Structure formats: C-alpha cells, structure tokens
UniProtKB/Swiss-Prot annotation:
Species assigned in the record: Actinobacillus pleuropneumoniae serotype 7 (strain AP76)
Gene Ontology MF term list: 4 iron, 4 sulfur cluster binding; ATP binding; magnesium ion binding; sulfurtransferase activity; tRNA binding
CDD domains: TtcA-like
Protein name: tRNA-cytidine(32) 2-sulfurtransferase
Domain of life: Bacteria
Gene Ontology cellular-component annotations: cytoplasm
HAMAP family: TtcA
Annotated EC: 2.8.1.-
Subcellular location: Cytoplasm
Extra facts: The thiolation reaction likely consists of two steps: a first activation step by ATP to form an adenylated intermediate of the target base of tRNA, and a second nucleophilic substitution step of the sulfur (S) atom supplied by the hydrosulfide attached to the Fe-S cluster.
Top EC class for this record: transferase
Catalytic function, reaction form: cytidine(32) in tRNA + S-sulfanyl-L-cysteinyl-[cysteine desulfurase] + AH2 + ATP = 2-thiocytidine(32) in tRNA + L-cysteinyl-[cysteine desulfurase] + A + AMP + diphosphate + H(+)
Lineage: Bacteria, Pseudomonadati, Pseudomonadota, Gammaproteobacteria, Pasteurellales
Amino acid sequence: MNQDTQSANTQQEKKIAYNFNKLQKRLRRNVGNAIADFNMIEDGDKVMVCLSGGKDSYTLLDILLNLKLSAPIHFDIVAVNLDQKQPGFPEHTLPEYLESIGVEYKIVEENTYGIVKEKIPEGKTTCSLCSRLRRGILYRTATELGATKIALGHHRDDMLETLFLNMFYGGKLKSMPPKLISDDGKQIVIRPLAYCKEKDIEKYSQAKQFPIIPCNLCGSQPNLQRQVVKEMLQTWDRQYPGRIETMFSAMQNITLSHLCDPSLFDFKGLKLGQVLDGVEGDIAFDKAEIPNQPLIQDEDEQTTDYGENGMIQFKQVQ
C-alpha cells in the first residue's frame, strides 16, 4: 500500500469517526431532552428496557447506557426480551450480546406465538393480539423485577405514523404518548426515543453493527394501513424538506380552543364579558401567520431541539 492510499484511508476513517460521533451526540441530546421534558427517569429508578432485537430497541438500550455513565441522577437498567417461541428465533443472539456488554438482563419465555396462531386465521395480521399478550407479560415482568419504568423503543416517526393512522382510519386526534401510566396505575411506560428520527436510528444501528433479529419471523402479514401512512410520510419528507419536523412540532403546540372537542374545552360555557387567560379567541378574525418555510433540519447538521426551551436538562452533551 503506497503513501497516498494510506493517507486516503486515514482521511476516510477520520470522516467516518467524525460522522458517527456527531450522530451519537445528536441521539444522546434528543433522548436527554425527551427524558427531561417529560420527567421520564428519576433518581433511583429501575428502568426495564424492552429489547426485541430490532434497531430501535438496540439503539434505545445503547443510548441509555451511554447517558447513565454521566447522568446527574442514579438509575439502574435491566434489559428484557420476550421469547415468544416463534419458529427460527435465534435464542442465543440476545443473551450473547447482552453478556458481551455486561448489562443485567432477563429472557422471558412465553409461547404467545402458539396462542396467536390458534386464534388468528392464516394470512391475517396478528400484531394486535400479539401486542396485547406482550403488554400483559411485560407488565408482569416489570413487577417481578421491581422495575419502576418500562422503556419502549418507539421513535418520532412511529408517533407521527400513529397520529395519521388514528386520523385517517379511527377518526381520532391521537398519537403515542411519550409517557403513560397503565390502566391499573401500577406501571409507567416511557418512550425516550420520542424526539429521534428513524433515519438517525438506522444509521446508528448500522454503525454499531447490532445483531438484528428479523421482525417477520411470526409470518404475519404487514399492517397495510401503517405501511401506507409510512410511505406517505417518507414521500413528504423527500418532496417537502422540513415538513416532518413541522408536523412533530405541531403535536407539541396544541390550542384546544381552536379544535372541536367539547370535553376538552368549554365552548358552551363561553359568555359575553368573559376574559379567558391563555385562550386565543381574538385571532379567529386574523389571518394566520404561517412561515414561508417549514422547520428544515438537515439530517447531518441538526441543530433544532424539540426539547422544552431548547435546553438539555437531563444531560449536557459536550
């Protein structure tokens, strides 16, 4: 190898390392902001990270472990995988990976695959029943482990897809919450990747070479409605840069008095002479001030924060 080739290789290696560090910093910042904005993790928490073997949950675990090293609070992490006894599931993959990084983990074995195959006709989407079964098992496991928070790997794009799915097919203005409490009040579920782009997670997963487990082992048909919405958003992202960022920002800037749900705003109770603090009544007659350009964020030069006041409260990233 001549000197010019060595120099070119060195430059390429430096560029790859630089881009990876920038990507990791961006993910850490977004996760830290989400944790701070929604008070996802508190001092003394035991966080149960649900690990499926896909890119999202691997990235979630990796970033949380990274933040834990220098967070201003103490919290513990335990990774949990549900082995649903799907044919061809590589049982050795996750234990080997988790042991290699030295994280506490538990593999829960439940034959939900058999239950789903028995209940759902061949060729139909099994995701709904499978999800309900998984939820119950994971709630039970969290209680057994003494976990105070259950962390899932849903990201910004998942939340937007769910918003449009509910609007298009369910007639509801509803998405995935970044933090929720179970119906019985015993479990708190958090989504620390709420501010993270799927494209960033894909790049990070490839760079880290996580041992990905395919998500189609169950043989279920894909959710066609979700796939349609996903492709729609991807098309918008290509054709109208910044639209995705603007839509996600809209989910955090809601004016209830300008929607139509009487259970959330007392339209019937409005009377002459009232002055309502924080209600933008007068602007109903004004022309809406809409920026000429959406919130544009280059995927490799992201500077805009979704976090509250743009501040990183959970973890200052250098």
